[in-house]
A protein has these predicted regions:
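Histidine-centered, transition-metal-coordinating active-site segments
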Residues: 2-174
Length: 174
C-alpha cells in the first residue's frame, strides 16, 4: 500500500479517524466528541502519557509482537516465535512510560532476535521481495485492463479518504 500510495498507513489512519464523513469517525463521536482527536494524539505520539503510544508504536509494541507471531505461524517457521506471555507479565508502568522488569530481559532478547531472524529469513527474502514487486505490477496492469478508475488515485499517489474506502473487492473483481 505505502509503496504504491506514498503515504504512511499511520497518516492514512489518522486522516480516516478525523474525517467527519467516515463511519469510524461517526462511531467514535457517538462515544465521545473528543475521542477521534484523542486517538490521533496517541497515534502521532503527542499524548501527554508516553505509555499510551508506546503500546501501539514503539520497538516493543502490540502490532510488532502480533505480526511476528502471526507471520511465523502463517509461514510455518519458528523464526518469529518468542514468549509473549512472559513479556506481558514483566511489563510495568513507571513515570507514565512502559518498562520491563529485569526478569523479563531474556524474553525481550528473544523478541529482538525473532524480529531479526524474521526480517532476514522471511520479510527480506529475495522470493518475498520479488512477490511484492509482482503484486504491485499485477495491480497496475489489472487496473489498466479492467479500466478500473478507482485505482487511478492509488497508482498516482493521490488517494483521498473517499477513494480509499471505495477500493473494495467488489470494485476489483465484479
Amino acid at each position: 500500500f505505502e509503496t504504491l500510495h506514498k503515504k504512511h498507513h499511520e497518516q492514512m489512519t489518522c486522516d480516516l479517524i478525523l474525517d467527519p464523513e467516515t463511519e469510524i469517525h461517526k462511531a467514535l463521536i457517538k462515544e465521545d466528541e473528543a475521542l477521534p482527536q484523542n486517538i490521533v494524539l496517541i497515534l502521532t505520539h503527542q499524548h501527554s502519557k508516553p505509555m499510551m503510544y508506546q503500546m501501539i508504536s514503539s520497538q516493543l509494541d502490540a502490532d510488532r509482537m502480533d505480526y511476528l507471531l502471526r507471520d511465523a505461524y502463517a509461514t510455518g517457521t519458528s523464526y518469529g516465535n518468542f514468549d509473549l506471555e512472559r513479556i506481558l507479565r514483566t511489563l510495568r508502568v513507571k513515570n507514565d512510560s512502559l518498562c520491563v522488569k529485569m526478569s523479563g530481559m531474556h524474553s525481550i532478547e528473544d523478541y529482538i532476535m525473532a524480529r531479526y531472524h524474521m526480517y532476514w529469513q522471511v520479510y527480506l527474502h529475495p522470493d518475498a521481495k520479488s512477490y511484492e514487486i509482482m503484486i504491485q505490477q499485477f495491480f497496475k496492469r489489472y487496473a489498466q485492463v479492467r479500466n478500473i478508475e478507482v485505482f487511478e488515485p492509488l497508482l498516482n499517489g493521490e488517494l483521498s479518504n473517499k477513494d480509499f474506502y471505495l477500493m473494495d473487492e467488489h470494485r476489483m473483481f465484479y
